[in-house]
Amino acid sequence: MSKKSKKPENQICANKKARHEYFIEETFEAGLSLQGWEVKAIRAGKMTITEAYIIFRNNEAFLFGAHIQPLLSSSTHVSPDSIRTRKLLLNRREIEKLMGAVNQKGYACVPLSCYWKNSLVKCQIGLALGKKQHDKRKTLKDRDWERDKQRGFKKDLD
């Protein structure tokens, strides 16, 4: 039986689908601009980024499609919008580099994971190139081969 992998203590959520759908060329760390109720909901583990992606407007980067489910005990004077567009905090050079690459054919900018760094929420984003169907099959085949190889090696030791 396979053991269920535990996520690191500071990790909030991960986009496992991104590594299957894309070749990750380069990764960046970006801060997230959040409201108070969002931070409280994230601490409760109510964030998902599986369908999220990054868009660029007016030389700024935004996380679009990330879902933060509001808590029932959240503030009554603020109406929570669970899928609002959130600003990513990056350096100007990083934004220019990402925008230049995304404008090329086939490149995309996707969130890979969100985690706590001290008391701040950070988002690891990746500059990604889309995989074709045969690339996905090759990746699965290589992963299965490595697993079988490890099993065989383990049996030889016993």
UniProtKB/Swiss-Prot annotation:
Instruction: Cite the Gene3D superfamilies for this sequence.
Output: 2.40.280.10
Supply the gene name.
smpB
Q: Which UniProt keywords apply?
A: Cytoplasm, RNA-binding
Identify the GO cellular component terms for this protein: cytosol
Main subcellular localisation: cytoplasm
**Segments of this protein annotated with the region Disordered:** 135-158
This protein's record includes keyword tRNA-binding: no
The UniProt entry's coiled-coil ranges are none
Where is this chain's protein located in or outside the cell? Cytoplasm
What spans are recorded as compositionally biased (Basic and acidic residues)?
A: 141-158
- Family designation: Belongs to the SmpB family.
What protein is this chain from?
SsrA-binding protein
One GO molecular-function annotation for this sequence?
Answer: RNA binding
Q: Name one GO biological process term.
A: trans-translation
Does the keyword Cytoplasm feature in the UniProt annotation?
Answer: yes
Q: Which organism is it from?
A: Psychrobacter cryohalolentis (strain ATCC BAA-1226 / DSM 17306 / VKM B-2378 / K5)
Q: Which Pfam families match?
A: SmpB (PF01668)
Its biological function? Required for rescue of stalled ribosomes mediated by trans-translation. Binds to transfer-messenger RNA (tmRNA), required for stable association of tmRNA with ribosomes. tmRNA and SmpB together mimic tRNA shape, replacing the anticodon stem-loop with SmpB. tmRNA is encoded by the ssrA gene; the 2 termini fold to resemble tRNA(Ala) and it encodes a 'tag peptide', a short internal open reading frame. During trans-translation Ala-aminoacylated tmRNA acts like a tRNA, entering the A-site of stalled ribosomes, displacing the stalled mRNA.
